[in-house]
Amino acid sequence: MNRINQLFSIKQKDILSIYFCAGFPTLEGTASTIKVLEKKGINMIEIGIPFSDPMADGLVIQHAATRALKNGMTLKLLFDQLKDIRKEVQIPLVLMGYLNPIMQYGFKDFCRTCRETGIDGVIIPDLPFKDYMEEYRSIAEEQDVRIIMLITPETSEERIRLI
Protein backbone atom coordinates (compact mmCIF):
# COMPACT_ATOMS: atom_id res chain seq x y z
CA MET A 1 0.00 0.00 0.00
CA ASN A 2 1.23 3.48 -0.87
CA ARG A 3 2.55 5.41 2.16
CA ILE A 4 0.00 8.21 1.60
CA ASN A 5 -2.87 5.72 1.80
CA GLN A 6 -1.28 4.15 4.89
CA LEU A 7 -0.98 7.51 6.61
CA PHE A 8 -4.62 8.43 6.01
CA SER A 9 -5.86 4.99 7.05
CA ILE A 10 -3.95 5.17 10.35
CA LYS A 11 -4.31 8.87 11.13
CA GLN A 12 -7.41 10.59 9.82
CA LYS A 13 -7.00 13.83 11.78
CA ASP A 14 -4.19 16.17 12.73
CA ILE A 15 -1.89 15.30 9.84
CA LEU A 16 0.92 17.81 9.50
CA SER A 17 2.35 18.19 6.01
CA ILE A 18 5.20 20.61 5.34
CA TYR A 19 6.24 22.13 2.00
CA PHE A 20 9.72 23.31 1.12
CA CYS A 21 11.46 24.09 -2.16
CA ALA A 22 14.29 21.72 -3.08
CA GLY A 23 17.60 23.54 -3.37
CA PHE A 24 16.59 26.42 -1.09
CA PRO A 25 18.24 27.90 0.85
CA THR A 26 21.19 25.67 -0.08
CA LEU A 27 21.64 23.20 -2.89
CA GLU A 28 22.86 20.40 -0.62
CA GLY A 29 20.24 20.63 2.13
CA THR A 30 17.28 18.77 0.65
CA ALA A 31 17.85 15.26 2.05
CA SER A 32 18.96 16.53 5.46
CA THR A 33 15.89 18.80 5.68
CA ILE A 34 13.62 15.81 5.04
CA LYS A 35 15.37 13.75 7.73
CA VAL A 36 15.10 16.53 10.31
CA LEU A 37 11.43 17.16 9.52
CA GLU A 38 10.58 13.48 10.01
CA LYS A 39 12.45 13.41 13.33
CA LYS A 40 10.47 16.48 14.44
CA GLY A 41 7.17 14.63 13.90
CA ILE A 42 6.07 15.82 10.48
CA ASN A 43 3.65 13.29 8.93
CA MET A 44 4.18 14.03 5.23
CA ILE A 45 6.50 16.28 3.21
CA GLU A 46 5.85 18.13 -0.06
CA ILE A 47 9.10 18.84 -1.88
CA GLY A 48 8.85 21.67 -4.38
CA ILE A 49 10.49 21.26 -7.77
CA PRO A 50 11.80 24.75 -8.59
CA PHE A 51 10.59 26.25 -11.85
CA SER A 52 11.42 29.54 -13.57
CA ASP A 53 7.77 30.56 -14.05
CA PRO A 54 5.83 29.43 -10.97
CA MET A 55 2.56 31.14 -11.96
CA ALA A 56 0.35 29.52 -9.29
CA ASP A 57 2.69 30.33 -6.41
CA GLY A 58 2.98 33.36 -4.17
CA LEU A 59 5.99 35.62 -3.83
CA VAL A 60 7.71 33.58 -1.10
CA ILE A 61 7.70 30.36 -3.14
CA GLN A 62 8.62 32.27 -6.32
CA HIS A 63 11.65 33.69 -4.50
CA ALA A 64 12.64 30.27 -3.14
CA ALA A 65 12.34 28.72 -6.62
CA THR A 66 14.45 31.47 -8.18
CA ARG A 67 17.16 31.01 -5.54
CA ALA A 68 17.05 27.21 -5.88
CA LEU A 69 17.51 27.46 -9.64
CA LYS A 70 20.40 29.92 -9.18
CA ASN A 71 21.89 27.43 -6.72
CA GLY A 72 21.81 24.83 -9.51
CA MET A 73 18.82 22.67 -8.54
CA THR A 74 17.39 20.53 -11.34
CA LEU A 75 14.93 17.67 -11.35
CA LYS A 76 17.72 15.20 -12.14
CA LEU A 77 19.81 16.53 -9.25
CA LEU A 78 16.81 16.32 -6.92
CA PHE A 79 16.31 12.65 -7.79
CA ASP A 80 20.05 12.05 -7.29
CA GLN A 81 19.85 13.67 -3.84
CA LEU A 82 16.85 11.53 -2.89
CA LYS A 83 18.06 8.18 -4.27
CA ASP A 84 18.92 6.81 -0.81
CA ILE A 85 16.33 8.72 1.24
CA ARG A 86 14.22 5.63 1.91
CA LYS A 87 17.06 4.05 3.88
CA GLU A 88 16.29 6.57 6.63
CA VAL A 89 12.89 8.20 5.99
CA GLN A 90 9.56 6.37 6.27
CA ILE A 91 6.93 9.13 5.97
CA PRO A 92 5.17 9.90 2.68
CA LEU A 93 7.07 12.15 0.29
CA VAL A 94 5.26 14.16 -2.38
CA LEU A 95 6.85 16.16 -5.18
CA MET A 96 5.10 19.36 -6.20
CA GLY A 97 5.99 20.99 -9.47
CA TYR A 98 4.86 22.35 -12.78
CA LEU A 99 4.26 20.23 -15.85
CA ASN A 100 7.01 21.81 -17.99
CA PRO A 101 10.08 20.41 -16.18
CA ILE A 102 8.32 17.07 -15.73
CA MET A 103 7.63 16.86 -19.47
CA GLN A 104 11.23 17.82 -20.23
CA TYR A 105 12.31 14.91 -18.03
CA GLY A 106 9.72 12.69 -19.75
CA PHE A 107 6.50 11.83 -17.90
CA LYS A 108 7.01 8.08 -18.00
CA ASP A 109 10.64 8.37 -16.88
CA PHE A 110 9.58 10.84 -14.20
CA CYS A 111 7.01 8.42 -12.75
CA ARG A 112 9.45 5.51 -12.93
CA THR A 113 12.13 7.54 -11.15
CA CYS A 114 9.58 8.63 -8.52
CA ARG A 115 8.82 4.97 -7.81
CA GLU A 116 12.49 4.00 -7.72
CA THR A 117 13.27 6.91 -5.39
CA GLY A 118 10.35 6.24 -3.07
CA ILE A 119 8.22 9.26 -3.96
CA ASP A 120 4.60 8.49 -3.07
CA GLY A 121 2.72 11.24 -4.85
CA VAL A 122 2.99 14.21 -7.15
CA ILE A 123 1.09 17.49 -7.27
CA ILE A 124 1.15 19.16 -10.69
CA PRO A 125 -0.98 22.31 -10.36
CA ASP A 126 -1.03 23.09 -14.09
CA LEU A 127 -1.92 19.57 -15.27
CA PRO A 128 -5.46 19.77 -16.68
CA PHE A 129 -7.71 17.11 -15.17
CA LYS A 130 -8.91 15.96 -18.61
CA ASP A 131 -5.31 15.45 -19.79
CA TYR A 132 -4.52 13.59 -16.59
CA MET A 133 -7.46 11.23 -17.07
CA GLU A 134 -6.82 10.65 -20.79
CA GLU A 135 -3.03 10.61 -21.02
CA TYR A 136 -1.21 10.44 -17.70
CA ARG A 137 -3.26 8.52 -15.15
CA SER A 138 -2.41 5.05 -16.43
CA ILE A 139 1.31 5.86 -16.59
CA ALA A 140 1.36 7.12 -13.00
CA GLU A 141 -0.74 4.23 -11.69
CA GLU A 142 1.53 1.72 -13.43
CA GLN A 143 4.38 3.07 -11.29
CA ASP A 144 2.24 3.30 -8.10
CA VAL A 145 2.64 7.08 -8.03
CA ARG A 146 -0.39 9.07 -6.87
CA ILE A 147 -1.16 12.21 -8.85
CA ILE A 148 -2.83 14.51 -6.34
CA MET A 149 -5.34 16.91 -7.86
CA LEU A 150 -6.10 20.23 -6.20
CA ILE A 151 -9.50 21.75 -5.54
CA THR A 152 -10.55 25.27 -4.59
CA PRO A 153 -13.70 26.72 -3.04
CA GLU A 154 -14.84 27.38 -6.62
CA THR A 155 -14.41 23.75 -7.74
CA SER A 156 -17.77 22.28 -8.72
CA GLU A 157 -19.27 19.36 -6.82
CA GLU A 158 -19.21 17.34 -10.05
CA ARG A 159 -15.49 17.88 -10.53
CA ILE A 160 -14.78 17.12 -6.86
CA ARG A 161 -16.56 13.77 -7.28
CA LEU A 162 -14.45 13.03 -10.37
CA ILE A 163 -11.25 13.87 -8.52
Where are these regions (language model features)?
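Conserved beta-strand positions in the central sheet of alpha/beta enzyme cores
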Residues: 17, 43-46, 123, 149
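Active-site mouth loops of central-metabolism enzymes
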Residues: 16-30, 94-106, 148-155
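Conserved, mostly hydrophobic/aromatic
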Residues: 18, 37, 45-48, 114, ...
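A structural motif
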Residues: 39-42, 119
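Active-site-adjacent beta->alpha loops and helix N-cap segments on the catalytic face
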Residues: 1-10, 52-61, 70-85, 102-108, ...
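Glycine/proline-rich, positively charged
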Residues: 95-127
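Catalytic cores of alpha/beta
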Residues: 27-38, 110, 155-162
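N-terminal small/glycine-rich loop or linker at the start of catalytic domains
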Residues: 3-24, 58-59, 64, 85-96
